[in-house]
């Protein structure tokens, strides 16, 4: 098939690369990094504090650490619906502030049951954070660079996963557990302030529709995504083992 002169000229022009590192995208990455640092600096020291200071049994320790993830799983479907139907930025900033305030629960908790309740409440909030944050990032990233943008956005959480435990253990050894809880609170408040500066694009208001229970279930559980979800779940078991190594090393004093 012959091509016209205009088509040949248009094909010869290189495509314009849409900028990725915009002001709003960098703010979203910084806010995500703050959240990662605040969360992961507490991960390695919480078992040490519970077993060392409160003499919590291994059974209670397992429940306290795992209830966080279970609560996040429970809250994510509800937050996913709210994010799709509401103001994503408002939800993100509000949940971010709630996450910051939830760290104060560690400062006042004095029993295993209080830590369990704090972890459950914070897990519910964490489910909203990990749902609204990436969703708003998708709105900011240009569609032509979505894969690259989500890759760098996810790397900020990975960076927090790397630096957070190092910072947390150093602060715990020098200043104690309560300084970490307040530093996590401050990091989250700073992250919420950064998130509030993001100029999220306006989305059309969706009209409410009547949904049958089957449609609701199909929307919440994407059947084609189940195999990928199983793969992620299997890979997450390794993280559970890694998060326990620092406690095991502390118990054996390095004689593994």
Residues covered by each model-derived region:
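Juxtamembrane intracellular "pre-TM" segments in multi-pass secondary transporters
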Residues: 8-21, 200-228
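Helix-breaking motifs and short loop linkers at transmembrane-helix boundaries and internal kinks
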Residues: 55, 87, 108-110
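Paired small-residue
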Residues: 113-121
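C-terminal membrane-cytosol helix-exit motif in multi-pass small-molecule transporters
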Residues: 186-205
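Conserved small/polar residues in nucleotide/adenosyl-binding loops
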Residues: 245-254
């Amino acid at each position: 098939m012959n091509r016209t002169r205009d088509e040949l000229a248009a094909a010869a022009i290189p495509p314009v690369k849409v900028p990725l590192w915009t002001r709003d995208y960098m703010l979203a990455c910084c806010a995500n990094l703050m959240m990662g640092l605040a969360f992961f600096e507490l991960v390695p020291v919480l078992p040490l504090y519970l077993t060392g200071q409160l003499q919590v049994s291994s059974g209670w320790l397992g429940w306290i650490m795992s209830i966080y993830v279970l609560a996040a799983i429970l809250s994510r479907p509800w937050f996913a619906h709210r994010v799709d139907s509401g103001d994503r930025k408002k939800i993100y900033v509000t949940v971010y502030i709630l996450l910051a305030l939830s760290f104060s629960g560690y400062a006042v908790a004095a029993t295993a049951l209080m830590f369990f309740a704090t972890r459950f409440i914070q897990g519910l909030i964490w489910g909203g954070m990990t749902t609204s944050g990436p969703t708003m990032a998708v709105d900011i990233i240009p569609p032509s660079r979505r894969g690259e943008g989500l890759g760098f956005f996810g790397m900020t959480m990975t960076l927090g996963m790397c630096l957070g435990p190092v910072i947390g253990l150093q602060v715990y050894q020098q200043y104690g557990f309560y300084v970490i809880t307040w530093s996590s609170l401050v990091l989250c408040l700073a992250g919420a302030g950064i998130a509030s500066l993001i100029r999220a694009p306006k989305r059309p208001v969706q009209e409410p529709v009547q949904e049958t229970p089957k449609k609701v279930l199909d929307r919440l559980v994407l059947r084609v995504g189940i195999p990928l979800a199983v793969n992620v779940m299997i890979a997450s078991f390794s993280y559970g083992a890694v998060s326990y190594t620092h406690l095991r090393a502390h118990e054996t004093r390095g004689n593994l």
